[in-house]
Regions:
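Hydrophobic h-region of N-terminal signal peptides that target proteins for export
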Residues: 10-17
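Beta-solenoid repeat scaffold
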Residues: 64-106
């Protein structure tokens, strides 16, 4: 019995020895691996705080410590090659590392250009970063930019650099879909990137900038949160001007409803941006005072507005942007000013609005209607007030 107890103690002691928190000051970019090796075997480090300048070589180092991977070809038949990023370590094709890093703190790190490629991103034919695509490109660091897949690893908590001024699309990748619980984005960043937390399943805490101008496409798409989820803000700030396509599409399960009660300062809402937001909770919602199609119509992903949000005059509701809205009072408020009706905008709420929508007093002077805006409702006879009605 004593022997069994002794072995148990030794085993427990061994586990402690393999769990290490390391603080590293990188004085010369590209030497993170050397600095870590001074303190511990990289395979045993589960918590890492990096101080100083880091380049692509250093990013590659901590990604290896966090079980990051390169993409693997899953179908090389014929002329078509498909690439895919593995979801969770060891569950799909591709090699994994022996790293154990879970906690990554880059708050005092400065990203600088140079060093090796730290990842290979997968793109579709439209040059949009995806999880499965036709071709790949190597990723290199830029000064003060958190690049795509730069934080890709099986991490549970990630703190972005305080010095970062921009975050590119899909910075955390897909490896941490199940493991990531906490994320902190610094105040120095004004725009949340595309696919920031796309498909993450167990989030417990998100810290966002106090001043925020934009939320990129699919930033919180299919996002699920754990019990006791919290954010550091009570609502999205008044500085928020645009929400990209599908930003809250599916999966968020009304978690973000309370944070979207006041969207009166927005200038752009992309396709399906609010698809999963439950409008029934918007009892005191402040809608924008002007809803109008500006000089540049957004593409399918709203990318024109994502990069140049001020090109649009006031506010556009693209197709299906408010698909989930069932409260006609909200639509009446929207319709008090000139507006653009996007494809599928009223689906599936139009039937309940038939009486009200026939009333021309609801509308402003200018109405732009896409050809499929009233799809499946061809029997509806609309009376349009004086002004311009454009059917595109």
């Amino acid at each position: 019995m004593k022997r069994i107890a002794l072995l148990a103690i030794l085993a427990f002691t061994s586990l402690i020895a393999y769990s290490k928190y390391v603080i590293v000051n990188v004085e010369i970019p590209g030497t993170l691996d050397y600095e870590v090796a001074k303190q511990a075997d990289w395979k045993t480090v589960d918590s890492l705080k990096v101080i100083g300048g880091i380049n692509g070589t250093d990013v590659r180092t901590y990604r290896r410590m966090g079980r990051g991977r390169e993409p693997a070809i899953v179908d090389g038949s014929g002329k078509h090659h498909y690439y895919i990023y593995n979801e969770i370590a060891g569950t799909y094709v591709g090699n994994t590392t022996e790293g154990k890093l879970k906690y990554l703190d880059l708050s005092e790190a400065n990203i600088v250009a140079g060093g090796d490629a730290y990842a290979t991103a997968v793109y579709d034919d439209d040059e949009k970063i995806v999880s499965v695509g036709r071709h790949t490109k190597d990723c290199y660091t830029e000064d003060n930019v958190v690049g795509s897949l730069m934080l890709s690893g099986e991490f549970s908590e990630v703190i972005f650099p305080n010095s970062a001024t921009r975050i590119d699309a899909w910075p955390i990748g897909s490896i941490a879909w199940k493991s990531l619980k906490k994320v902190k984005v610094p105040d120095s960043v004004r725009v949340l990137p595309e696919m920031l937390l796309w498909r993450f399943e167990n989030l417990e805490s998100i810290e966002l900038p106090s001043v925020l101008e934009g939320i990129g496409s699919q930033a919180f798409s299919y996002t699920k949160v754990g019990f006791g989820f919290k954010m550091n803000i009570e609502k999205f700030p008044e500085s928020l001007r645009y929400i990209g396509a599908g930003a809250f599409y599916e999966g968020s399960y009304r978690i973000f409803d309370d944070y979207l009660k006041d969207i009166s300062n927005l200038v752009y809402i992309g396709n399906n941006a609010l698809q999963s937001v439950d409008s029934r909770s918007w009892t005191s919602l402040r809608m924008p005072s002007v809803v109008y199609l500006g000089s540049h119509k957004p593409d399918e992903y709203g990318r024109r507005q994502f990069y140049n949000p001020w090109e649009i005059a006031d506010l556009t509701f693209s197709r299906e942007a408010c698909k989930s809205i069932t409260d006609t009072r909200i639509l009446e408020e929207i319709a008090k000013k000139p507006f653009f009706i996007g494809q599928g905008f009223f689906t599936p709420v139009l039937r309940s609005m038939k009486v009200r929508i026939d009333n021309p007093e609801m509308y402003g002077d200018t109405i732009c209607v896409e050809s499929k805006a009233f799809k499946d409702f061809s029997e509806l006879n609309l009376e349009i007030p004086e002004g311009q009605w454009i059917r595109s």
